[in-house]
Structure formats: structure tokens, C-alpha cells
Amino acid sequence: PLWAQVNALLPEGALDGFSRFTVFTDGLDETLAYVSPLDDTGTRWELAVDPADAGELDWFTETVLHEYTHYLTLNDTQADYGAPESGARYCEEGMVARSGSYLDDFYHAFWTDYLHDRLANPDSYGFYLRHQADFVTDYASTDPSEDIAESFTYFVLWDAPEGDAVWEEKLNFFYRYPELVEFRTQARARLGL
């Protein structure tokens, strides 16, 4: 039933990059789901879901979309694993976002002005409080990867924002990509939105 629940949320073919579905538990109210690459190139992925935390439908939906966004933005078409760090592109340990990727474009659009502030004070919640109006959730302020995952989740789940707050600009960012708009349309149809 968990696989069916996940499959029911996402557009047809969205899970083609996944080779493994894992059911695990770390107890109630802990990690609901995660994704992880299965190889050193980000080509094949694992999706893991905890049935102990999967009962609340809204939280389950938000979490699956969030975790799927990590796959969407960090798979081998979007990121280069093992490439040398580049000052021109967004980097995480062991990964460089490809030029023109969703994550690199998002980083350049929204994070270059934050970087020194974020690195100077690793207290995520303090950083969030200084920039609260710029993030859709406090967790989004963790780093660009979490920000894009949270932003894409609510791009899918919410109606298009009409304001000009930075968090709204982040949700509207995804309208630049016809394939992401199509993903949104199909996912919303599956969710009855």
C-alpha cells in the first residue's frame, strides 16, 4: 500500500529513476521518508518511507513531494557527482550543480546574496528569522537544496501566488520550466486540487 500511495501522488513515469523502494521505521514522529542516490553518479535512486509516519495524508503528501524534489534537482541530469567544486555553480559536498540546472538557476536567482550571511552564522533558525519573509517554511532556510525542495512542494500544492514577496517569487520560479508546470498539473489532478 505504501508504494501505491506514493505512486498515486506523482505523475506517470515520475518514479522511473528509482531502482529501490525501502520500507523502514525509526519510530513514530521521526523521519517519514528520504531519497538517496544508489550510485556515485546520481543515476539510480532509492525512495524510503516509514509506515509509522505515513498515516497523516497532508504530511505524507508534502514529505513525498519534498523528497521527490531532491531526486528531481540532484539526479545525474541536474548534478555532477565528483566534479571539482566551482565558484560559478552551486556546490555541496561531492556534488556540483550543472549549469542551467533547476538547482543552479534557483541558487543564482535567490541565494547568492544570502551566502555570506548563512555561512557566517550556521544557526539555521537565526538565519531564518533574519530572512523570514523570503522562505516558504523555516526548514527552507537550511540551504538551497532544502529551499528548492520546500518551494517546489508548495508550487505543486498551492495556487499560484500573486504577491511579490521573495517566497512567492520562489514558487513562481518554476513556471519558467514547462516540464515542471506539466508535473504540477498532473500531480494536482491526482491530488484533486
Enumerate the predicted regions with their spans.
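Stable alpha-helical elements in mature extracytoplasmic
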Residues: L2, V6, F60, V64, ...
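Pan-zinc metallopeptidase signature
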Residues: L129-L193
